[in-house]
Amino acid sequence: MRAGHALVLFSGGQDSTTCLAWALERFERVETIGFDYGQRHHVELEARTAVLAALRGRFPAWSARLGDDHMVDLAVLGQISDTALTRDTAIQMTEAGLPNTFVPGRNLLFFQLAAAVGYRRGLHTLVGGMCETDFSGYPDCRDDTLKALQVALSLGMGQRFTIETPLMWIDKAETWEMARQLGGDELVQLIVEDTHTCYHGVRGALHAWGHGCGECPACALRRAGHERWTAQHTA
């Protein structure tokens, strides 16, 4: 275990749950932060509560290191963002080559606010679930963006901050495998049953890969990754 404290950007989805488990294996104390920005899939905020409770109940060693959860009201982001994540509109590609689920500046703002909380609480490692492999092309998920942001935050705060992105260079199948290696089949099942990824907020029938509509970009990535992981894991 690494000495020190970390703050995890935690949405209640598969990726951030895996990153939270990763942090709990590595740091003496871990806190979480979430954001309510009027997202259409608001059910993810309920999922994050369920996931935190399940982690505390099923993983005693992690529970001892899991500290406070911080929820930030970012309604203003929803007010200035006309996207399929904050409006009841169909998901489609834009002329810029990005899906209209892209909320401009979202991750930049998330990390800035996380750093402000971390500054106050002595949490100088910020952990996020961004990646450049199985992703929708969002520019604020790119490694170069986050490295530049790490420098800007450290300069602007007058303290050294580190941004950790454990999933940056692995695909969704490898993300499922990371979860299994961190917490065994119990963590995998927790992710299937309790986390939420679907952009449409569907919590109906439980699929092998979890809840969701099965059609939106988030569900498609999660489903395909689970199928590849299952094929590899059972081969």
Curated annotation (Swiss-Prot):
<keyword id="KW-0862">Zinc</keyword>
<dbReference type="InterPro" id="IPR018317">
    <property type="entry name" value="QueC"/>
</dbReference>
<comment type="similarity">
    <text>Belongs to the QueC family.</text>
</comment>
<dbReference type="GO" id="GO:0008270">
    <property type="term" value="F:zinc ion binding"/>
</dbReference>
<feature type="binding site">
    <location>
        <position position="219"/>
    </location>
    <ligand>
        <name>Zn(2+)</name>
    </ligand>
</feature>
<dbReference type="Pfam" id="PF06508">
    <property type="entry name" value="QueC"/>
</dbReference>
<comment type="pathway">
    <text>Purine metabolism; 7-cyano-7-deazaguanine biosynthesis.</text>
</comment>
<dbReference type="GO" id="GO:0008616">
    <property type="term" value="P:queuosine biosynthetic process"/>
</dbReference>
<feature type="binding site">
    <location>
        <position position="216"/>
    </location>
    <ligand>
        <name>Zn(2+)</name>
    </ligand>
</feature>
<dbReference type="GO" id="GO:0016879">
    <property type="term" value="F:ligase activity, forming carbon-nitrogen bonds"/>
</dbReference>
<dbReference type="GO" id="GO:0005524">
    <property type="term" value="F:ATP binding"/>
</dbReference>
<keyword id="KW-0479">Metal-binding</keyword>
<keyword id="KW-0436">Ligase</keyword>
<protein>
    <recommendedName>
        <fullName>7-cyano-7-deazaguanine synthase</fullName>
        <ecNumber>6.3.4.20</ecNumber>
    </recommendedName>
</protein>
<keyword id="KW-0067">ATP-binding</keyword>
<keyword id="KW-0671">Queuosine biosynthesis</keyword>
<feature type="binding site">
    <location>
        <begin position="10"/>
        <end position="20"/>
    </location>
    <ligand>
        <name>ATP</name>
    </ligand>
</feature>
<feature type="binding site">
    <location>
        <position position="198"/>
    </location>
    <ligand>
        <name>Zn(2+)</name>
    </ligand>
</feature>
<feature type="binding site">
    <location>
        <position position="213"/>
    </location>
    <ligand>
        <name>Zn(2+)</name>
    </ligand>
</feature>
<dbReference type="InterPro" id="IPR014729">
    <property type="entry name" value="Rossmann-like_a/b/a_fold"/>
</dbReference>
<comment type="function">
    <text>Catalyzes the ATP-dependent conversion of 7-carboxy-7-deazaguanine (CDG) to 7-cyano-7-deazaguanine (preQ(0)).</text>
</comment>
<keyword id="KW-0547">Nucleotide-binding</keyword>
